[in-house]
């Protein structure tokens, strides 16, 4: 779950980090009201969970509440990288002296927490890694040891602060807060970019990003609730898929893909691409899918406006071919048939039974996945 | 013998009375696996498919000499199940369970490693070794009937079955197939699994099945280039068409912070002389060429 900036900032604040005063608004009137309350120039920040909002026009400075109102009328409803702006975070404008980068992730290779720190900030870490890789410091923290004094010291020194100054202490407490948020909230990412030194000399997270592990959401009911009320970057199809129990990712082609297992489904997409086609989606029915899951999954693609051909690639083990065929039959019955072409390749458990069931529906079963993929691509072109 | 399991591997199934645990215990027994005990707290004293059930792993180990464990416990309790197995003294733990919070996996896996225990998974199909008729996992039995000299290490389940099937059809036999798991943090990662199987004198060739996310494939390529592995290898990487920032079914299959895309993995393999199959179906052909058959 990707937290909005205002939610992430609230977390930082909860952990004792000083943040610029601000509130989130859902209407231009509210934006004006908050701007009046804060007083002076304010920043309007579109709350969409993508990087690079600024360049896309999602961050604006307003000198007066009236200007804030005007800007907000344009910003609400704006489409930024596929996401519609429904919330605007209005915060006090602060003059910035210096920008840094600080993030915390889980390092897969060492199985430790990893801080990435750079005295240059405001741009993506990819950008820094490309242009000035020597500026990135990596500090690993073993989860069984936890964050220690010396970890914090090496990060804060690297960011350019002098020991035992007020700024040093502020920066240290931000490092500590980020670590605590990471652990307490089961986060995959805690980032402050830019982390800034203001004209007044305060160290503050000017922007904040937190991504919480979806598998741990049950431990944080308040976040679960927030996600339900505001699904952020999850499409309607993806929400539906999650409810039924399969994985769905939207892509932009016209060949609908259904597979079982993440790896095989990705390989099926790649196969379609290999033969010159374009996958419309990734849809993994998972292991041991029942006919109901197959039915609901297929219905999604039958109704999908962009999908011309549906290519199912099932390698049965726990998943049974007859169960899959029954799901196909039920989906077609509920939809009253379809004009879309369906290409099925199925191997494994109860294959023969599945073949007979599909034959009755006039759907031929392919033994060879390459042949089936070629056929699907050919039909999509026709 | 294989590197991870052999004739003396005695298995305890944690979560044996659940739907999955019970179903796959039967399949493991049918395959020939020595499943000696099961564990479900509160169900001690019962049996599942003739296998005695205990309340603790410690008891299963004490009474039956179990030295390996397969975990089918629900996600909320699975990390604890790993810790329990480690403390009970087993040497190998296979975690089938999906959706374990990654911070919990992190702690459990680190604890196990500090005690010298090998963890496969979580979110994995497990491992199967046809030469010793032993399976700790959920792979379909019928594909793993032909023992031989090819090791398959993979981040995916069904794709492992698919490629194993293609290998067997092409006349190869399997020494061991290990699905290391689709989560971002796993006990034994793809690179370590390849390194382990390479140490087996019975293994002639290694098939590596990678996917988007992380850098295990790149690390493996580096190990190969440095000579840590000196056996013929063939790779396949799933997810060439996966868009950045989206999880492709597996929690670990995500292109993030500018790294982990299929292209860089494929390039890393090719740069060190490991051929990469364009499709899963090309793997046997490439392996035959590697082994000069």
UniProtKB/Swiss-Prot annotation, chain A:
It comes from the Archaea. It catalyses: succinate + ATP + CoA = succinyl-CoA + ADP + phosphate; GTP + succinate + CoA = succinyl-CoA + GDP + phosphate. ATP binds at residues 45, 52-54, 94, 99. Binds 1 Mg(2+) ion per subunit. Mg(2+) binds at residues 193, 207. Pfam families: ATP-grasp_2 (PF08442), Ligase_CoA (PF00549). Residues 9-240 form the ATP-grasp domain. Pathway: Carbohydrate metabolism; tricarboxylic acid cycle; succinate from succinyl-CoA (ligase route): step 1/1. Its EC number is 6.2.1.5. Its cofactor is Mg(2+). Substrate binds at residues 260, 317-319. One of its GO terms (biological process) is succinyl-CoA metabolic process. Gene3D superfamilies: ATP-grasp fold, A domain, ATP-grasp fold, B domain, Succinyl-CoA synthetase domains. Keywords: ATP-binding, Ligase, Magnesium, Metal-binding, Nucleotide-binding, Tricarboxylic acid cycle. GO terms for molecular function: ATP binding; magnesium ion binding; succinate-CoA ligase (ADP-forming) activity; succinate-CoA ligase (GDP-forming) activity. InterPro entries: ATP-grasp, ATP-grasp_succ-CoA_synth-type, ATP_grasp_subdomain_1, Succ-CoA_synthase_bsu_CS, SUCC_ACL_C, Succ_CoA_ligase-like_bsu, Succinyl-CoA_synth-like. GO terms for cellular component: succinate-CoA ligase complex. Heterotetramer of two alpha and two beta subunits. Succinyl-CoA synthetase functions in the citric acid cycle (TCA), coupling the hydrolysis of succinyl-CoA to the synthesis of either ATP or GTP and thus represents the only step of substrate-level phosphorylation in the TCA. The beta subunit provides nucleotide specificity of the enzyme and binds the substrate succinate, while the binding sites for coenzyme A and phosphate are found in the alpha subunit. Belongs to the succinate/malate CoA ligase beta subunit family. NCBIfam families: PRK00696.1, sucCoAbeta. This is Succinate--CoA ligase [ADP-forming] subunit beta. It comes from Pyrobaculum arsenaticum (strain DSM 13514 / JCM 11321 / PZ6).
